[in-house]
Amino acid sequence: MTTQFSVAGIELELFRYPASQESNLQAWDAADEHLINTLVEGGQTAVPTAIINDSFGALSCALSRLNPDWPLNVETDARTSFLGAEQNHHRNQLPMDNLTRFTSRDALPCDLALVLMKLPKNLTYFAHQLMRLSQVLPAGCKVLVGAKAKSINASLLEVFATHLGPASASLAWKKTRVITCISDGKPRALPKEVTWDIPEFNLHISNLSNVFAANKLDIGARIMLDNLPQGDFKTIVDLGCGNGVLGLRAAQLYPNADIHFIDDSEMAVASAKANWANNQLPAEKGHFHWDDCMTHLPDGVEPDLVLCNPPFHQGEAITDHIAWQMFLDARRRLKNGGILHIVGNRHLAYHVKLQRLFKNCTTVASNGKFVILQAQK
């Protein structure tokens, strides 16, 4: 794993968060380098700047290294991005008092003079971000977006024109391009939340824009809902909750249980919280945590059931280390006799990991693509 970042005379040591030993993963990519080179070559001075979708702080660390007084407004939906940026600022002895942090639902400041962005994987979320920017950016404000060259096409440039202003792409460098968009100063209305029903479970679901499977029940969740365990559970964790559908169904099946919803995405946690209220479930039984797995779950919470539909990517990176951390956290936090109940793609071979961690693993159900596994502490 490469940790030495060297671009445009800026030297940093950067790590992913949480730590990963996978040799092909690092805390930045060529699009970060391209953005920084574009800034430095353009002679950009320190003006109020928004940095959006900065995975682990490469952009904020680089600008802070250039000028410790550079006023930076850092926005991300991912808790691990905040924690990674904080870790990398401390590691490189960079100030934090020039940073103001925002989630993807917070109101952005109105004095921005420059925006740096990374193109997210979810283009519905990206369009939402552009609409939010349109509400605060003055006409003529420059927005620079770094992305893989293969992700940039006429349709993407049209997304800019529709939601923020005209845009053009640079020449390719290390298989990346920088898109320059000039705000037209016209505020756009934000889109309404996506809502849909699961009639067989009498659930009404709403999703914010960065939530997985935004307008339907994904296949993994479907097979999980049909195969939840029986038992008199008192404390349940929906780990990587997304819109909260597993925890919502658990609340119906185990009405005496406290349900804890945890996700790295702030929009996911907000969606789960809204869905809990919209389905008229008891307020005192639902608990919501924007967290890196169960890292900051209160000490007194000792679950007897953890439900998990683990992701196998972090941003653009395909990786199983998030699932591994989820399984480790479940083993650490479950009470003795407690159950980890997961769904995963067959080819990911999660049964090997669970057998290694728990010394037991049972196949509960399966189909051609997915498998439900259960391990007991």
Curated annotation (Swiss-Prot):
What is the protein's given name?
Answer: Ribosomal RNA large subunit methyltransferase G
EC number from the UniProt entry: 2.1.1.174
Q: What does this protein do?
A: Specifically methylates the guanine in position 1835 (m2G1835) of 23S rRNA.
Q: Where in the cell is it found?
A: Cytoplasm
> Which GO molecular function entries does the Swiss-Prot or TrEMBL record give?
23S rRNA (guanine(1835)-N(2))-methyltransferase activity; nucleic acid binding
> Can you quote a single GO CC term?
cytoplasm
Span-the-membrane segments of this chain are none
Enzymatic reactions: guanosine(1835) in 23S rRNA + S-adenosyl-L-methionine = N(2)-methylguanosine(1835) in 23S rRNA + S-adenosyl-L-homocysteine + H(+)
Name any one Pfam family assigned in the record: MTS
The record, for CDD domains, names: AdoMet_MTases
Q: Which UniProt keywords apply?
A: Cytoplasm, Methyltransferase, rRNA processing, S-adenosyl-L-methionine, Transferase
